[in-house]
Amino acid sequence: MSSGGLLLLLGLLTLCAELTPVSSKDRH
């Protein structure tokens, strides 16, 4: 189990959340 894959997944998730912060604010 390489931590590289986990890091990549985490990075992608964070990127998605940072790139689409409007969807979360739009709900408000």
Swiss-Prot record:
GO terms for cellular component: extracellular region. Residues 1-24 form the signal peptide. Keywords: Disulfide bond, Ion channel impairing toxin, Neurotoxin, Potassium channel impairing toxin, Presynaptic neurotoxin, Secreted, Signal, Toxin. Expressed by the venom gland. GO terms for molecular function: potassium channel regulator activity; toxin activity. Beta-1-bungarotoxin is a presynaptic neurotoxin of the venom. The B chain is homologous to venom basic protease inhibitors but has no protease inhibitor activity and blocks voltage-gated potassium channels (Kv). This is Beta-bungarotoxin B chain-like. It comes from Bungarus multicinctus (Many-banded krait). The lineage of its organism: Eukaryota, Metazoa, Chordata, Craniata, Vertebrata.
